[in-house]
């Protein structure tokens, strides 16, 4: 801080320690769709595990008590022998008996390696939640675009399952990007949903172009996004979940298609490789 800022009573809240009881006032933007649910500690019994892809494992936990969460939120999982919890988005819909998690194995990652190699059915797993403000703005009642990369599918899956279960009748589109067909998962689930819900469209996209039997979309997700609706995204709400490079490319495409910050909601997936890069808003967004 500069001396004049100290004289004005300003502090750096990120490194200040309260010495007594205090009252904090803050300007917080209220969202009519936000549910302020209490955090709680849970212990779940592992009901099922499955290799969704060669690098992504599905884990289904039965919590020891009902868990309330908004579709799109995540939990913190405490892994034995690993310092600090790890965050995993919930893939199941609110109200489901089981909590579904998608865990991508990170090279050299102690936590994800343990969850892939050691965790087994009937084990007990501690977790805490729910966290995050990544949720569907249902009050908007307009076209929803879900854009996911890899295991970033978890939050969008929960969100669209929730919307369809509630009878949303506006267009809902899911773009899911994967490197190859082996890394694409839950395709059968989404194809079944397209049969049951005429307003739902599923667009799987493979970035690897070496599969001669693949007749679906290829390239990067943002490239396929450009061709959707002739590149005009006005009147939509977009929800993006995945690695930061994919998020930034898709934000640029959406904004070029006249969809702006207030209608674009993101959740970035970081790994140990991203540790040196602080989490931040998209440089394309003006609001701090």
Predicted regions and their residues:
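A short, basic/flexible loop-to-alpha-helix module at the beginning of a structural domain
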Residues: 129-140
């Amino acid at each position: 801080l500069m001396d004049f800022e100290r004289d004005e009573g300003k502090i750096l809240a990120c490194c200040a320690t309260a010495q007594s009881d205090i009252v904090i006032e803050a300007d917080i933007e209220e969202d009519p769709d936000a549910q302020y649910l209490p955090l709680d500690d849970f212990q779940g019994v592992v009901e099922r595990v499955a290799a969704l892809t060669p690098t992504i494992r599905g884990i289904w936990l039965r919590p020891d008590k009902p868990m309330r969460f908004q579709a799109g939120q995540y939990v913190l999982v405490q892994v034995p022998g690993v310092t600090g919890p790890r965050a995993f988005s919930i893939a199941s819909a609110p109200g489901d008996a089981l909590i579904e998690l998608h865990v991508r194995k990170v090279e050299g990652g102690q936590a994800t390696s343990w969850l892939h190699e050691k965790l087994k059915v009937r084990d007990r797993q501690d977790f805490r939640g729910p966290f995050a403000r990544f949720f569907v703005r249902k009050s908007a009642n307009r076209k929803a675009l879900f854009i996911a990369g890899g295991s970033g599918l978890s939050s969008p899956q929960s969100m669209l399952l929730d919307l369809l279960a509630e009878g949303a009748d506006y267009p809902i589109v899911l773009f899911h990007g994967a490197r190859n067909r082996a890394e694409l998962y839950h395709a059968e689930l989404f194809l079944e949903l397209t049969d049951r819900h005429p307003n739902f469209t599923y667009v799987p996209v493979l970035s690897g172009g070496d599969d001669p039997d693949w007749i679906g979309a290829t390239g990067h997700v943002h490239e396929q996004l450009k061709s959707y609706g002739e590149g005009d995204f006005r009147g939509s709400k977009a929800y993006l979940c995945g690695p930061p490079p994919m998020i930034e490319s898709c934000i640029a495409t959406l904004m070029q298609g006249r969809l702006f910050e207030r209608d674009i909601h993101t959740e970035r997936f970081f790994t140990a490789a991203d540790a040196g890069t602080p989490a931040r808003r998209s440089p394309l967004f003006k609001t701090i």
